[in-house]
Structures are given as C-alpha cells and as structure tokens.
A protein has these predicted regions:
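Short, surface-exposed, polar/charged, turn-prone segments marking secondary-structure boundaries
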Residues: 29-31, 120-123, 148-150
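Generic detector of short alpha-helix boundary/capping microenvironments
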Residues: 38, 129-130
Length: 155
C-alpha cells in the first residue's frame, strides 16, 4: 500500500507526514511471501538477495562514504561508495528514473581511476556488461550496483 493517509484520522500522528509511508500491515498478504511464484514471494526473495549482497560488499559499510556523482544525465541518479581503507573496493550505484533507456557515460569515471578495465559487473544481478565506447545502457526504472569486473588471473 502506498500513501496511506489514514494516519490523518489519529490526532497523535496527524502532524507527522512520515506515517503516510507506514500503512498497517496486511498479514494475510504478507504470508503470501511463502508461496512460490507470487509477487510477494518474488519481492521478498529479491530483497533478501540485495541484503545478502550488501552484507558481503565492504564498500556498503557505513563509513559516511557516499559521493554523489554528476553523470550529466538528468534521468540518472548516481553515487559512489568506496571503502575508506580499501580504495579499490568501490560500488557505483546508478538508477534510471526515466521511462526510456538511458546511457551512462563512464569515461569521466575512467579518468578518475574507476572502470578502466572496460567491463563492469552489477552486484545486484551478478551479470557483467562490456562497455561500448564507455557507455552502459540502463533500462527504464532499473538500478545497478556497478563494480569493476576483475578477471581472476589463471582462470
């Protein structure tokens, strides 16, 4: 449920608009997360996966290590997370807020030392993408947690 304005009927909550995003939980619907193939199950499993990835990615540790990145595209929001002690461990979080695919130009980041190998990996999906002329296509409404893909030597 989005934007539940029933909080306005409670005098103790009416002055605090944060309650608009805190609707009552429909526990029957929540239980559907256990039924394979339901939207509730797919969302629940997806969130569990993202939490697991965050827990194993040191750049996501809370060191107040967020840097907003101007990618010169008004439809894309980007921020860089870098572990302060492990400078090579960085994640570029990029989200496309447009209804059309957008292109992320990583050439500027390459000049700053990021994504020089020409291939990036999305930590959220595990998929790697080769860059074409320093451009990466971001589908509409999608986000990526990008890190530089490093092939293991000898494998």
């Amino acid at each position: 449920t989005c934007n539940d304005d029933s909080f306005l009927d409670d005098a103790a909550k009416a002055g605090d608009s944060r309650w608009v995003h805190r609707p009552r939980i429909d526990w029957e619907r929540a239980e559907r997360r256990r039924i394979r193939g339901t939207p509730e199950q797919r969302i629940f499993e997806g969130l569990k996966h993202l939490i697991a990835v965050r827990k194993t990615t040191s750049a996501f540790a809370d060191f107040n290590n967020r840097e907003l990145i101007d990618v010169e595209n008004p439809h894309l929001f980007a921020l860089l997370r870098t572990h302060p002690a492990l400078q090579g461990d960085s994640v570029l979080v990029v989200a496309n807020f447009d209804v059309n695919a957008q292109f992320l130009d990583l050439e500027g980041l390459s000049k700053r030392g990021y994504f020089r190998l020409g291939q990036v990996q999305d930590l959220a999906t595990g998929l790697s993408s080769a860059l074409s002329n320093g451009q990466l296509e971001i589908p509409p409404g999608r986000f990526y947690w990008l890190t530089e893909h490093r092939a293991l030597a000898g494998f």
